Swiss-Prot record:
One Gene Ontology MF term: zinc ion binding
A biological process term (GO) from this entry: positive regulation of macroautophagy
Localization per Swiss-Prot or TrEMBL: Vacuole
WD repeat residues: 135-172, 178-223, 230-274, 280-319, 377-420, 560-601, 917-959
Name recorded for this polypeptide: Restriction of telomere capping protein 1
Length: 1105
């Protein structure tokens, strides 16, 4: 018997392979029916090989591209199923490109007992029928099943309706073809439960129309056609509302590409326009779904928002914003309410339906139902949210193949469990039971809430503050709806933070309406201390009324002991959106009176026995994170090389800035980098630097250059550009090395550099007075002689190339006149002061010279006109930039040198020449610029010094790309700009972006720029300013004066500019003050910046400082 069964199973498998091919892509056996063949063969061999399931997950691989699915709740009696599988009531309908299949499931929906090809009318329920040929244009875009009816919306605007028999046979009964474009949504009208037979159907299309069809009639024309307006606004989704309170009222909701939510009443005689229209989303709204019990609809859009809105008649009058809003991490493609309430709501304490009661609204129906959403982009997740905790998903489903989700629905099932059916873009149907606890499901269903800790610590970037948040996991926003007619609005509020823990047994009710206002869209009031001006009554009052009874600030004023507690005596209130002309999310109010509270009939409060959640801010006085120091460094650090400056000069200037705020370590880093740059790099045309290989090659050949090449270095070298005093008569009339006097262009550049240096020194003279202890009189002569005294007396290693005359001096060097000495003193004055100020040890007393007579030997050993004058290293590079000597002194030097034979030491060879070794590679110096820069960046990154990292990246990135990776540079600059913006140093942030390297700038702009959504509301009726009526009416009139200084809804003009009393016609050029007055950007800039006023121009005593 066993061999016959195996033979029969093998034959059926081969037969199924001939029809469908190999469709089982190595799917595990516990994943249910992985192909059409596996479901059929398993049902036939059930008695011999029982189905092996380890959890309730069903997988089916579709052989064609699929886009939509629905559920058919109709009992089927299939002849090829066993007795236990008779009268099956829950089935899956999957549609796609030339594809429409009915998957019959068993009673617990754990496996597929049969699949039926609906498009092939000759196929009843057997498997030996082939799929429809490709020449049939049945590209199904949406499917909706009800009772025994299956409606299909095609991409060509055609609607087909199939009738399903009890034996599984499907036949085509209707074809409707009045739409011009793709069908996006289908629904049935007049349906109250899952098993009612439909008689009417609505369809929403890309052509912007909704059509009503009578399925009892044989006419292919619609009964009614409605649209949202005169122009075509594509309809993404539409649905019939079964919760209409009016008698025989047929309400249909739709969402459009404009982001609008429209409400239609099909009983109206005209039937052409919506009864109500709300602009909820700022981009295309892509999906909607009506709540199973109440008149609430959830919508999702491309603006990454999920909105819950009450569309009931009692809530229509002044509703302009959603009741609830969930911000998601991606554009929302589909959103669905769960069909069953979540039984786990009891985990929030007691069951919600025992205390969430109200006269007009049962909140348990809103907060006990979950909602799920999928995303538009290639995202492989379905996120499940609950309004009790809307800031974090309750569960997240991730497909095992990591393929994007195409569509999903909540499935009806006998056990009333939360079950989701999905199809992916890889054409795989899957079933997920969220209430089934199994270890294998945990890899695909994650619960982010379980992964969070009760206590969270985070740093505030840029300010050095620390925040600790404590929050119980199941006590977040447990809402209770009470009557607004309560005598005590504030309830029993404990005013002391410690007393809330002492009386932990007694519950304290905190009324949220007193904390944030009685409306979620209401802006908070502004309170100021009373003024005593005599002309107070003659001044313009603030448009914002003062309502002390409904604000947290008023309550704080009535209880002065709360001011010492810094707001810790109360639980953290919810963040609200301010209904103003500026934006919903801004705390700045625009316009006048806020929305009235007369339409609000309930208030929300949460009941806790102690403070949960609570936030503990900690301020740490970190010496290395001083805000003033940060601002000084960001303002004064040079992040680019000015004209006439070199990179060495910029490093020295930045060193002086760091020393001025007592950042001596950073000062030394800048100075060491300056010294290493002068040693390793050769400057070409004041801007171009050679790479390391070229520099090393040039260094070995520098000794072979003749003296004429040294003389070719003009007076307008590094220090010549740095100091602009070489246009004097003593230098302009002397031609050294064949160079004439400075041209007009060079003179101008030198003067500009000198002016810039003087300006920098003057701006820092006050901050560096305590570091300077050198006498002003004759300071340059004194410093120069003292330094050469120290240099001649220290035990340094002497280069053998240098003559004794160069080291110790000779009496024959008397050819230098007094004019040359004065010239040196004059030109080196500014640089000496800048470098000495940059040294942390500059405050130490310099040894006095032994005599006041000129020391010619020390003078000739000086490296002339180099910015390494104060550097601790004097090497051959300084000699190469030696100042031209007089002819007499030079002849004496040549005679002295010619009588000597030079011998190089081994140390000189190791430093200056390539020593022959086994590898043949030159010895690398540890103080090369690249090595020092790499170590400086590593140190700054480990210390968290974002200013030093960013400044070094801006200055050295182009020359040292091998040291500074592009990713690191982008991360440092992005974080630096973010901190600058948080500190309101916007000008500095813009300078960082503009001076960023070319290959980093584009990525940096994309990283730092973000979309800002601004929504403007009328200051009188508090409705969104869209003015669609005027826009439609005046779109053909070229001379029409269309704008947003008036409101179409209330037909009133908005407030004029408080400065010029002219209408504010623009949307983005309007600036509003916290007092409620507003005006043009140019007018307020003239008032506050140019005229330097501090108070509001309306005279309401509001001060911006």
């Amino acid at each position: 018997m066993s061999s016959n069964a195996n033979s029969q199973h093998s034959t059926l498998a081969k037969f199924a392979f001939n029809i469908y091919g190999s469709l089982n892509h190595a799917t595990p056996s516990y994943e249910g029916s992985a192909s059409p063949s596996s479901s059929y063969s398993s049902s036939r061999s059930k008695t011999n090989e029982p189905y092996n399931y380890r959890f309730n997950k069903l997988v089916y691989n579709c052989e064609r591209e699929v886009t939509t699915l629905s559920q058919l709740n109709y009992p089927l009696s299939l002849s090829n199923t066993f007795q236990s599988d008779q009268n099956l009531s829950h089935h899956v309908i999957i549609g796609g490109r030339n594809y429409l299949k009915l998957l019959a499931l068993n009673e617990d929906q754990s496996r597929i007992v049969q699949d039926i090809n609906v498009l092939d009318q000759s196929s009843i329920y057997t498997h030996n029928s082939r799929v429809p040929s490709t020449n049939k244009l049945n590209n199904i875009n949406t499917v909706k099943a009800q009772s025994d009816t299956i409606g299909c919306g095609l991409s060509n605007g055609l609607i087909t309706v199939y009738k399903v028999g009890s034996n599984g046979k499907c036949r085509l009964i209707h074809k409707f073809s009045d739409h011009k474009r793709c069908i996006n949504s289908l629904d049935y009208v007049g349906i109250r439960n899952l098993y009612d037979a439909p008689t009417q159907m609505i369809s929403g299309s890309q052509d912007g129309s909704i059509k009503l069809w009578d399925m009892r009639s044989s006419s292919p024309r619609p009964m009614l056609t409605i649209s949202s307006g005169s122009h075509s606004d594509p309809i993404r989704s539409c649905q019939y509302s079964p919760h209409s309170q009016g008698r025989n009222k047929l309400v249909v909701l739709s969402v459009h590409d404009s982001g609008a939510l429209c409400k239609f009443d099909l009983r109206l005689s005209n039937g052409h326009g919506p009864e109500r229209k709300w602009n909820i989303h700022t981009g295309p709204a892509l999906s909607l779904h009506i709540h199973p019990e109440k008149e609430y609809v959830v919508t999702g859009g491309r603006d990454q928002k999920i909105c819950v809105f009450n569309y009931g008649d009692s809530q229509i009058s002044n509703r302009i914003t959603p009741d609830e809003m969930i911000n998601t991490y991606g554009p929302v493609m589909k959103v669905r309410w769960c069909l069953y309430p979540d039984a786990s709501t009891s985990q929030f304490g007691e069951p919600l339906d025992t205390f969430q009661q109200s006269n007009d609204f049962n909140s348990s129906s809103l907060y006990s139902y979950d909602l799920a959403c999928s995303y538009l982009n290639d995202d492989s997740t379905v996120a499940i949210y609950n309004l009790n905790r809307k800031f974090i998903p309750k569960e997240v489903i991730t497909t095992s193949s990591n393929k994007p989700i195409q569509n999903f629905i909540w499935a009806n099932n006998p056990g009333s469990s939360r079950k989701i059916w999905t199809i992916t873009k890889s054409n795989v149907f899957s079933s997920y039971d969220l209430d089934m606890h199994d270890s294998l499901l945990e890899s695909e269903i994650s619960k982010p809430l379980d992964e969070l800790a009760n206590v969270t610590v985070d740093w505030n970037n840029g300010f050095g503050d620390l925040c600790l948040a404590n929050q119980e996991k199941y006590e977040f926003e447990i809402t209770e709806v009470e009557s607004q007619a309560s005598d005590n609005d504030m309830g029993d509020i404990d005013t002391e933070y410690s007393s809330r823990y002492e009386r932990s047994n007694s519950n304290s009710v905190i009324d949220e309406s007193s904390l944030i206002g009685s409306s979620s869209a209401e802006k908070p009031p502004l309170f100021r201390s009373s003024t005593h001006y005599s002309m107070h009554m003659a001044k313009s009052p603030s448009p914002v009324p003062r309502r002390g009874s409904t604000s947290f600030a008023a309550h704080s004023e009535s209880q002065p002991n709360l001011s010492n507690m810094q707001g810790l005596s109360m639980s953290r209130p919810k963040l609200t959106r301010n209904l103003s002309q500026a934006t919903e999310d801004s705390s700045i109010s625009i316009g006048s009176a806020p929305q009235s509270n007369i339409h609000l009939k309930s208030k929300r409060s949460f009941q806790v026995s102690y403070a949960s959640p609570y936030l503990v801010p900690v301020s740490l006085p970190l010496s290395l994170n001083d805000e003033n120091v940060f601002e000084i460094l960001s303002n004064n650090y040079l992040i680019s090389i000015p004209d006439g400056f070199t990179l060495v000069d910029v490093c020295l200037l930045n060193a002086s800035v760091a020393a001025s705020v007592q950042r001596f370590r950073e000062c030394q880093i800048w100075r060491v980098l300056a010294v290493s740059l002068e040693e390793d790099y050769v400057q070409i045309d004041n801007t171009t630097f050679l790479s390391d290989p070229e520099l090393e090659h040039n260094e070995t050949n520098q000794d072979e250059k003749i003296d004429d090449q040294k003389d070719a270095k003009s007076i307008s070298s590094d220090l010549g550009n740095f100091v602009g005093s070489y246009n004097s008569n003593s230098t302009s009339t002397t031609n050294y090395g064949g160079l004439g006097s400075l041209s007009a262009k060079d003179t101008t550049k030198a003067n500009n550099s000198n002016n810039l240096m003087d300006m920098i020194n003057r701006s820092r003279v006050n901050s560096m007075n305590h570091l300077q202890s050198i006498s002003p009189s004759g300071s340059h002569t004194f410093i120069r002689n003292a330094i050469h005294e120290n240099k001649s007396n220290e035990n340094a290693i002497v280069d053998d190339d240098e003559t004794d005359a160069a080291v110790h001096g000779t009496e024959g060097r008397i050819g230098t006149s007094h004019v040359s000495e004065d010239l040196d003193n004059e030109n080196l004055n500014i640089l000496n002061n800048a470098v000495l100020n940059s040294s942390p040890n500059s405050a130490m007393t310099t040894p006095h010279p032994q005599s006041n007579s000129p020391n010619y030997s020390n003078f000739f050993s000086l490296p002339k006109l180099s910015s390494t004058f104060m550097s601790p290293i004097y090497d051959e590079f300084a000699e190469k930039q030696e100042q031209p000597r007089s002819l007499k002194a030079e002849s004496l030097l040549n005679n002295d040198v010619s009588d000597r034979t030079t011998t190089k030491s081994e140390l000189t060879k190791a430093i200056k020449e390539e020593v022959d070794n086994s590898s043949g590679a030159p010895l690398k110096k540890a103080w090369k610029s690249s090595s020092l820069l790499e170590k400086a960046l590593a140190h700054a990154s480990n210390e968290g010094d974002i200013i030093l990292c960013s400044t070094l990246s801006l200055l050295f990135y182009d020359s040292f790309k091998q040291v500074i990776p592009q990713s690191s540079c982008l991360d440092w600059l992005g974080l630096y700009i973010e901190i600058l913006q948080r500190k309101r140093l916007f000008v500095n942030a813009i300078h960082v972006v503009n001076n960023a390297p070319d290959d980093v700038r584009s990525k940096l702009k994309n990283l730092t720029s973000g979309d800002v959504d601004l929504r403007f509301f009328c200051c009188w009726c508090q409705k969104l300013l869209v003015n669609e009526k005027s826009k439609e009416k005046l779109k053909n009139d070229v001379n029409a004066d269309f704008g947003y200084w008036y409101c179409d809804e209330c037909s009133q003009k908005q407030s004029n500019c408080i400065y010029c009393n002219e209408p504010c016609k623009g949307l983005t050029v309007v600036v509003s003050l916290k007092c409620g007055h507003r005006g043009h950007f140019g007018c307020l800039r003239e008032w506050f910046i140019e005229d330097e006023n501090n108070e509001c121009p309306g005279g309401c005593d509001y001060s911006v400082v």
